[in-house]
Amino acid sequence: MLVLTRKVGERIVIGDDIVITVLKIEGNSVKIGIEAPKHVKILREELYEELKNENVKAASVSKDDLKEVWKNDKGYKRPGPSS
């Protein structure tokens, strides 16, 4: 892990297209601004962990659960082109 010390207004550049700016420091909180291309996902760690856990849950559905969903949904017709 690289550890840097920055003051308000100072920046950190990552690669060619990500810039992190220290905007404000108040007590234990540091407000930062992040400039990055739209395709770069930027998430707070707690949201990232929550999404990861939800994905694990979704991927661990049992065969019995899937059978139950299909049984309860067998009247469903997928919309298609009108003929």
Curated annotation (Swiss-Prot):
- Predominantly, its location class is cytoplasm
Q: Which domain of life is it from?
A: Bacteria
Gene3D superfamilies, A to Z: Translational regulator CsrA (2.60.40.4380)
GO cellular component terms given for this protein: cytosol
What Pfam families has UniProt attached to this entry? CsrA
A single MF term (Gene Ontology):
mRNA 5'-UTR binding
> Which GO BP terms, alphabetically?
bacterial-type flagellum organization; mRNA catabolic process; negative regulation of translational initiation; regulation of bacterial-type flagellum assembly; regulation of carbohydrate metabolic process
Localized where?
Answer: Cytoplasm
Keyword hit for Repressor: yes
Cysteine pairs bridged by disulfides in the record: none
Q: Which PANTHER family match?
A: CARBON STORAGE REGULATOR
Its assembly, as annotated, is: Homodimer; the beta-strands of each monomer intercalate to form a hydrophobic core, while the alpha-helices form wings that extend away from the core.
| Role description | A translational regulator that binds mRNA to regulate translation initiation and/or mRNA stability. Usually binds in the 5'-UTR at or near the Shine-Dalgarno sequence preventing ribosome-binding, thus repressing translation. Its main target seems to be the major flagellin gene, while its function is anatagonized by FliW.
Please state which protein family the record places this protein in.
Belongs to the CsrA/RsmA family.
Q: NCBIfam families from the xrefs?
A: csrA, PRK01712.1
What's the protein here called?
Translational regulator CsrA
Naturally occurring in which organism (per UniProt)? Thermotoga neapolitana (strain ATCC 49049 / DSM 4359 / NBRC 107923 / NS-E)
Gene name of the encoded protein: csrA
